[in-house]
């Protein structure tokens, strides 16, 4: 019995531009054989890759809108299928009418990320590049956008594939030595295998470091300001933000709730959180604010404990901070109001404990704090080498490194050595999507915009 021909992909459609009003709105359609679709919609056959002025018509022939029709025939399109882009006036009613007409012609509403998923399934993008599409859209800083664009262009994937290919070459020689022990030719000995393995580990370590920097660009850090009332936390937030975001008064307890401000330092997004001053109080509202302060501390990446240069330090508060802070969080003590004592800005470090002297009022020493925040984040600029990475990429790179370390330990047993190389290769393949479970793909693409 002859096998059935594969069913052509059903057409999908979605509004590709952001909701709201604008000069231009775009409806995107992807599927098979869209020339007939365009003829019914516009009354003419579309010309490939040519911007054509067209009238978009409803089922009765009435004009919905007049705009630009673009047609990209398969496989030379974003999705690898026939793609139509209908550029009309960007009003929400017009866009909905145009989308409804596309659905009436047989397309179905695209799921989130379905256009990009089809591009991945049709080999137009690998999985890391597909994720970079969403990361570029969501980038909150120029540095993050540039890094996402490098990943989208394939730079991250190419480096992963280079390391994977080096692993394959080494595996090939190891397995040939195992499979053909009777051959007079020695394919590989331990003395040559370990230097090659060390070179691969060095490349992978460097890529992981750059990927960590990229992950920082993508997610940023939570920086929480804590301390007693009226020590200058809100003034410090305003200095970091470069504008007056928090109310500053001489009245203790002015800040009752957490105030969040997004700032950038060298392209790194920081989420700085000013909190209610920590003290014993009978005020119900203030107590709620203090409870929220501790909740913010418990999920902080960096805790800035602000103290007054004229005030006494309190061991009890320091002990509670130590108990409540996440173990991985950095803690920095900021001695504020040095202008009142005529002191100079300064950074000191004793047994790993960092202490900064500054004035939030004048701004003296705040640059020391900015530098310290970058240091706490582990940021060291790589210029144009940073690639935007996700947590799953970091996990895969670490897993591959763990297998390479295990391979080195098992170098005397070639079968175990080869197996660890295979597992390292498999971990890297998960980054680009060579080996990816359907549920992982569904999770990744479900986070995209509808029109992507």
Swiss-Prot record:
Q: What is its main location?
A: cytoplasm
Q: Name one GO molecular function term.
A: metal ion binding
Which residues are involved in binding (6S)-5-formyl-5,6,7,8-tetrahydrofolate? 28, 85, 124, 452
What are the EC numbers?
Answer: 3.6.-.-
Give the record's GO biological process terms: tRNA methylation; tRNA wobble uridine modification
Per UniProt, which keywords does this protein have?
A: Cytoplasm, GTP-binding, Hydrolase, Magnesium, Metal-binding, Nucleotide-binding, Potassium, tRNA processing
Q: Which cofactor does it need?
A: K(+)
One Pfam family named in its UniProt record: MnmE_helical
The compartments listed are: Cytoplasm
What positions does the entry give for Mg(2+) binding?
A: 234, 255
Q: Which GO terms describe its cellular component?
A: cytosol
Give me the residues that bind GTP, please: 230-235, 249-255, 274-277, 359-361
Q: Where is the signal peptide?
A: none
TrmE-type G domain ranges (all copies): 220-378
Q: Which InterPro entries match?
A: G_TrmE, GTP-bd, GTP-bd_TrmE_N, GTPase_MnmE, MnmE_dom2, MnmE_helical, P-loop_NTPase, Small_GTP-bd
Q: Which cysteines are joined by disulfide bonds?
A: none
Cite the binding residues for K(+).
230, 249, 251, 254
The free-text cofactor remark is: Binds 1 potassium ion per subunit.
Its family remark reads: Belongs to the TRAFAC class TrmE-Era-EngA-EngB-Septin-like GTPase superfamily. TrmE GTPase family.
What is the annotated role of this protein in its UniProt record?
A: Exhibits a very high intrinsic GTPase hydrolysis rate. Involved in the addition of a carboxymethylaminomethyl (cmnm) group at the wobble position (U34) of certain tRNAs, forming tRNA-cmnm(5)s(2)U34.
Q: How does it assemble?
A: Homodimer. Heterotetramer of two MnmE and two MnmG subunits.
Give the protein's recorded name. Answer: tRNA modification GTPase MnmE
Please give the organism: Azoarcus sp. (strain BH72)
């Amino acid at each position: 019995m002859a096998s059935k021909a594969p069913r052509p992909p059903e057409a999908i459609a979605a509004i590709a531009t952001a909701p709201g009003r604008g000069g231009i709105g775009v409806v995107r359609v992807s599927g098979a054989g869209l020339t007939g679709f365009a003829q019914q919609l516009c009354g003419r056959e579309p010309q490939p890759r040519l911007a054509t002025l067209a009238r978009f018509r409803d089922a009765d022939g009435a004009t919905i809108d007049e705009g630009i029709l673009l047609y990209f025939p398969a496989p030379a399109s974003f999705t690898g299928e026939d793609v139509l882009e209908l550029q009309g006036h960007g009003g929400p009613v017009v866009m909905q009418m145009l989308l409804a007409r596309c659905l009436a012609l047989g397309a179905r509403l695209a799921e989130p990320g379905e256009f990009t998923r089809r591009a991945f399934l049709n080999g137009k993008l690998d999985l890391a590049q597909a994720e970079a599409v969403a990361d570029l859209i969501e980038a909150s800083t120029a540095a993050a956008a540039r890094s996402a664009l490098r990943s989208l262009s394939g730079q991250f994937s190419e480096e992963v594939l280079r390391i994977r290919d080096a692993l394959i070459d080494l595996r090939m020689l190891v397995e040939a030595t195992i499979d053909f022990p009777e051959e007079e030719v020695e394919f590989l000995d331990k003395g040559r295998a370990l230097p090659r393995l060390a070179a691969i580990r060095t490349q992978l370590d460097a890529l992981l470091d750059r990927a960590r920097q990229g992950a920082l660009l993508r997610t940023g850090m939570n920086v929480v300001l804590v301390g007693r009332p009226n020590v200058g936390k809100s003034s410090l937030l305003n200095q970091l933000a470069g504008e007056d975001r928090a109310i500053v008064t001489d009245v203790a307890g002015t800040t009752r709730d957490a105030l969040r401000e997004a700032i950038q330092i060298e392209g790194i997004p920081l989420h700085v959180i000013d909190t209610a001053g920590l003290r014993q109080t009978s005020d119900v509202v203030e107590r709620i604010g203090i409870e929220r302060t501790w909740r913010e501390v418990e999920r902080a990446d960096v805790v800035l404990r602000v103290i007054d240069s004229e005030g006494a330090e309190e061991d009890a508060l320091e002990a509670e901070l130590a108990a409540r802070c996440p173990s991985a969080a950095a803690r920095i003590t900021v001695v504020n109001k040095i202008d009142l004592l005529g002191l100079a800005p300064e950074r000191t470090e004793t047994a790993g404990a960092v202490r900064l002297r500054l004035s939030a009022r004048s701004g003296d020493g705040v640059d020391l704090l900015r530098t310290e925040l970058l240091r706490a984040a582990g940021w060291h600029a790589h210029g144009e080498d940073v690639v935007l990475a996700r947590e799953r990429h970091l996990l895969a790179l670490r897993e591959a490194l763990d297998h390479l370390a295990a391979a080195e330990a098992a170098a005397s047993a070639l079968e175990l050595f080869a197996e660890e190389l295979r597992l390292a290769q498999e971990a890297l393949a998960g980054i680009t999507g060579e080996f990816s479970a359907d549920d992982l793909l569904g999770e990744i693409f479900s986070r995209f915009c509808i029109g992507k």
